[in-house]
Structures are given as C-alpha cells and as structure tokens.
Design a protein with these regions (language model features):
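Structural recognition of alpha->loop->beta junctions
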Residues: 68, 114-133
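Cofactor-binding loop segments of dinucleotide-utilizing enzymes, especially the Rossmann-like FAD-
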Residues: 28, 80, 107
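Conserved glycine-rich "GG(E/T)P / GGGxP" loop and the immediately following alpha-helix
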Residues: 70-97, 127-130, 134-147, 154-160
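Charged phosphate-binding loop/patch that engages nucleotide di/tri-phosphates or the phosphate backbone
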Residues: 152-171
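Structural preference for beta-strand elements that scaffold enzyme active sites
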Residues: 22-24, 74-76, 101-103, 123
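N-terminal [4Fe-4S]-dependent radical SAM core
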Residues: 1-26, 31, 35, 39-46, ...
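Short, surface-exposed acidic-centric catalytic microdomains
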Residues: 27-75
Length: 171
C-alpha cells in the first residue's frame, strides 16, 4: 500500500505528449532530499493530511472511474517519488496491472530505473528538481518545457528524448 494525495487531479501540462489531459497522482515518500523541496511533507511515506492509502488494485479501480469523467487513458505518477525505495514495489505492481499510458516523474536517474527493472511506463522523467534553475513548465503545440532544465526524459525503451528539460513533439 502507499499513500496518495487527495483528490486525484487532472492536468494537460504534466503528460509528455501534445494530445490530451492526464490524471496525476502524487505519492507520499521521497528519498532524494532536494534542497528547497517544493513539498517537503511529501517526503514522509506516512504523511496523512489529505491522503488516502491504496493498494495497486484499488488505485487502478479509482483511476478507471476518473478516466471516464476526464476522458483520458493517460496518467502521471509524481510525488514525493514513485521510485523512492518505499514506493518501488507498489509502483512495479501497479505498472503490471494498469491499462493507463503512464509517465513517471522521479528524482532518480535512468540507471536507478534500470537497476530496479521498472517496466510498463510510456515515459519517465528523471532528475532532481533544481530550484536554482527553476522555470515555469510550459506546453505548446511544438514542445513541452520541464520545470528544471537538468531533468531528462526517456521512453519505455530507455531512449533519451530530452536532456535539457525541453521535449519537442514530432508533428
């Protein structure tokens, strides 16, 4: 089980395509220790304020209901960190059963993703948030700019799609 921020939200900017809206879950628990963390309370995997505990199966069921309302099969897993040691087994199990196209946001690098044999995602955004070079996220018809230019984007075959925080869509 893991704790998820409530309510589960939707956003068009978080998912790495230029097509549609995505559901976004915020998982509790993070081991990255980023300076000036945006949500330091989310580092605690047992943080209870406005969160609910889910099994992977319960989360999939809840997301299926929301996907009908928002008409999407896209999901962003954020946090905290979905690939923090306290969340890895939950995330792996969830990715095995989900029908969603998943984009994972992690502060870890791609070697961490490979080391733990994370599979079943469509995209993974790697790299600690760098508050010194923060810039507002932006999504246009041509590109998506991440909040931190040191973050990298990979596809499900571990191919590097962006190394500078900007992903250009293939139109």
């Amino acid at each position: 089980m893991t704790r998820i921020l409530q309510p589960i939200s939707s956003s068009w900017i978080d998912y790495t395509d230029n097509e549609s809206i995505a559901l976004t879950i915020v998982m509790m628990g993070c081991d990255n220790g980023c300076p000036k963390c945006q949500n330091p309370e989310f580092q605690n995997p047992f943080y209870e304020n406005m969160t609910k505990e889910f099994t992977p199966e319960e989360l999939e069921k809840e997301l299926q209901k929301l996907s009908k309302r928002y008409r999407t099969n896209k999901l962003v897993m954020s946090g905290g960190d979905p690939l923090a040691p306290c969340n890895i087994e939950f995330t792996k199990k969830f990715l095995e059963i989900t029908t969603f196209d998943v984009c994972i946001y992690t502060g870890h690098d791609i070697e961490w993703v490979k080391k733990y044999n994370i599979k079943g995602f469509k995209f993974v955004k790697c790299g600690k948030f760098d508050y010194k070079s923060f810039r507002e996220s932006l999504k246009t018809d041509e590109m998506m700019r991440f909040a931190s230019p040191n973050q990298e984007l990979y596809d499900d075959n571990f191919n590097l799609l962006s190394k500078d925080g900007i992903y250009y869509f293939n139109n």
